[in-house]
């Protein structure tokens, strides 16, 4: 039998693009060679002699007789038969095609993820959208790969993975399944390392209030000073400053209360206004005998400042105010924003708390050089009345403790969040006071022994009754008045009880929010230390395993991978149905015998 061999142009090399015909998009040059643009195929083959038929020579038949020359068409080069292309070809073409097609198909290559026995299937390109996460980073997820089952196994919460996988599929949208609690889903977010940004978006979607970022000064020295005086939990020295501040506040409040005791108050009055030793017993007349002679005020006013400075309460108050002033000035000069510092309500309270001291000291200094005038006693009485009102402002120092007390901060946030409910409560009380005070006045109008002389006079009784205090100083005596009083008490109980659950709910919310924030901060520190330790220990083995897997993947063709995926489905179903150790061993044995299944890393 004679075999006709076709002479090949360009040494038998052909340009293949996507499995199509050779020479697609190419033109023939004068020398008979094909010239192709870069987009026409992958690459030109090497110019090598065409492979000879096995056991034959070029131009002779099997019997050794020369063959007649065949007619050639220089314009239309002949192609090899399909069987020759498949059987005899350049291996470089197949490798190039596998590389390009493998790079394109790797993005769409499917991957199996086993979550506590529940299998999920997705594409590698879907996971690669977030390369910094656990599933998106090949080096991170490699430690969970099971080469026998060709899947990644995670012993985690199964319902939560629906939301985790949707995060990759949707491009970053995180939705918690309805049958998963908040804390469990938050743990899954941290385990799969979705990042702080995903956690913040999750908290916002769930209704959590975003934590305000604490601004810090840019200067390093100012930052350290600001942290020491503003955030007691930042360091040991900051806690020491906070303890000193709390002690000074308590001493100031105790002094403010003790100086009003009768024994201390009388002693202070004697120090400030001692009796005049040369005062005559009987009434003295003036020079013209028209009236009594006014007592000399010079000995009383002149030594006023030394006696005030010698007062122990004044010394303690001065010491406390010096500390408050020092603390306020240091915090003001170290704050990151002077405008924000001036608008802060707590800083305004600090200024108001030390303001009365300087007014009192200025008043004492202003009265020191005064002489004995006729109207000076009246001016002193007026100034003392004003000073009493100003000294009352010192009681606001109690609010300085809220800077160092989480409980007071929670209470303040609760009242701030419940302003609408408190406004409704006051509005309902106002309506009830007007209604029941008018009713009790007209019910008691005909009685001579009534305690309600007018409607405004009955306001006090209505407020005391609606709040269920009941002092008893004002009470109705007639039957109609007692009926009105009973209705007033019942209405007061109902009015006050309505907004109380909302206020309690707000308090619980802020309380648990504060406690959860502290627990999360401690958990972050613990997780950070653990991740640092595991990263140092397992970094080398992970890198070596990933390199080995990459080499194994380079030798797997697209057809074999597709066949492995198709052939793995029955085995996976068998594994899901295995309910005993015997069935499990059989399924593993069948999996090991499956030679068409390739390891996919």
From Swiss-Prot:
Post-translational modification, as annotated: Glycosylated. Sumoylated on Lys-210, and Lys-524, preferentially with SUMO3. Sumoylation regulates the voltage sensitivity of the channel.
Name of the protein described by the UniProt record: Potassium voltage-gated channel subfamily A member 5
Domain of life: Eukaryota
Subcellular locations according to the entry: Cell membrane
Ranges for region Tetramerization domain: 1-200
Residues spanned by motif PDZ-binding: 599-601
Cross-link (Glycyl lysine isopeptide (Lys-Gly) (interchain with G-Cter in SUMO)), chain numbering: 210, 524
Glycosylation sites (chain numbering): 288
Topology, Extracellular side: 259-312, 367-383, 442-455, 476-482
Intramembrane feature spans: 456-467, 468-475
Pfam families with a match to the protein in the record: BTB_2, Ion_trans
Record PANTHER family: POTASSIUM VOLTAGE-GATED CHANNEL SUBFAMILY A MEMBER 5, VOLTAGE-GATED POTASSIUM CHANNEL
GO CC, one annotated term: plasma membrane
GO terms of biological process kind: membrane hyperpolarization; membrane repolarization during atrial cardiac muscle cell action potential; potassium ion export across plasma membrane; potassium ion transmembrane transport; protein homooligomerization; regulation of atrial cardiac muscle cell membrane repolarization; regulation of heart rate by cardiac conduction; regulation of potassium ion transport
SMART domains, per database record: BTB (SM00225)
UniProt topological domain (Cytoplasmic) ranges: 1-236, 335-345, 405-419, 512-601
Gene this protein is translated from: KCNA5
Taxonomic source organism: Mustela putorius furo
Motif (Selectivity filter): 468-473
Reaction(s) catalysed by this chain's protein: K(+)(in) = K(+)(out)
Recorded topology in the membrane: Multi-pass membrane protein
Membrane-spanning ranges: 237-258, 313-334, 346-366, 384-404, 420-441, 483-511
């Amino acid at each position: 039998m004679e075999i006709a061999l076709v002479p090949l142009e360009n040494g038998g090399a052909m340009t293949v693009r996507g499995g199509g015909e050779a020479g697609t998009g190419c033109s023939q040059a004068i020398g008979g060679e094909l010239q192709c643009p870069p987009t026409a195929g992958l690459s030109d083959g090497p110019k090598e002699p065409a492979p000879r038929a096995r056991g034959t020579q070029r131009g002779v038949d099997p019997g050794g007789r020369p063959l007649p020359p065949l007619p050639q068409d220089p314009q239309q080069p002949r192609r090899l038969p399909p069987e020759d292309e498949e059987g005899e070809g350049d291996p470089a073409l197949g490798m190039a095609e596998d590389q390009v097609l493998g790079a394109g198909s790797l993005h769409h290559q499917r991957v199996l993820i086993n979550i506590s026995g529940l299998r999920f299937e997705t594409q590698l390109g879907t996971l690669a959208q977030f390369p910094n996460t656990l599933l998106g980073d090949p080096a991170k997820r490699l430690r969970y790969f099971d080469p026998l089952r060709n899947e990644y196994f995670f012993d985690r919460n199964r319902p939560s993975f629906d939301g985790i996988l949707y995060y990759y599929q949707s491009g970053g949208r995180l939705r918690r399944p309805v049958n998963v609690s908040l804390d469990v889903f938050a743990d899954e977010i941290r385990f799969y390392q979705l990042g702080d940004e995903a956690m913040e978006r999750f908290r916002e979607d769930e209704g959590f209030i975003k934590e305000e970022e604490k601004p810090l000064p840019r200067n390093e020295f100012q930052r350290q000073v600001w942290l020491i005086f503003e955030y007691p939990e930042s360091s040991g020295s900051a806690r020491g400053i906070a303890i000193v501040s709390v002690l000074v506040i308590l001493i100031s409040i105790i002094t403010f209360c003790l100086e009003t005791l009768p024994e201390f108050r009388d002693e202070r009055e004697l120090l400030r206004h001692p009796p005049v030793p040369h005062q005559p017993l009987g009434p003295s007349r003036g020079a013209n005998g028209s009236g009594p002679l006014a007592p000399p005020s010079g000995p009383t006013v002149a030594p006023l400042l030394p006696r005030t400075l010698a007062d122990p309460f004044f010394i303690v108050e001065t010491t406390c105010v010096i500390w408050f002033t020092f603390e306020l000035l240091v915090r003001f000069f170290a704050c990151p924003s002077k405008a924000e510092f001036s608008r802060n309500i707590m800083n305004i309270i600090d200024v108001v708390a030390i303001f009365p001291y300087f007014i009192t000291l200025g008043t004492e200094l202003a009265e020191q050089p005064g002489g004995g005038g006729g109207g000076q006693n009246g001016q002193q009485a007026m100034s003392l009345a004003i000073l009493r009102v100003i000294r009352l402002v010192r009681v606001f120092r109690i609010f300085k403790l809220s800077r160092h007390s989480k409980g007071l901060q929670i209470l303040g946030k609760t009242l701030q969040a419940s302003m609408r409910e408190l406004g409704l409560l006051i509005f309902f009380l106002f309506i009830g006071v007007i209604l029941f005070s008018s009713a009790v006045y007209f019910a008691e109008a005909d009685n001579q022994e009534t305690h309600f002389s007018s409607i405004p006079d009955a306001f006090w009784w209505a407020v005391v009754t609606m709040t269920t205090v009941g002092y008893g100083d004002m009470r109705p005596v007639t039957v109609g008045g007692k009926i009105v009083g009973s209705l007033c008490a019942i209405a007061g109980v109902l009015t006050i009880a309505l907004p109380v659950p909302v206020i309690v709910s707000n308090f619980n919310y802020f309380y648990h929010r504060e406690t959860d924030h502290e627990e999360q901060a401690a958990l972050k520190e613990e997780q950070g230390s653990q991740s640092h330790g595991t990263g140092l220990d397992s970094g080398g083995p992970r890198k070596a395993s990933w390199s080995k897997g990459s080499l194994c993947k380079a030798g797997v063709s697209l057809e074999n991978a597709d066949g492995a995926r198709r052939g793995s489905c029955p085995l996976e179903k068998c594994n899901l149905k295995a309910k005993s150790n015997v069935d499990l061993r059989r399924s593993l044995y069948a999996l090991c015998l499956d030679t068409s299944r390739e390891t996919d890393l």
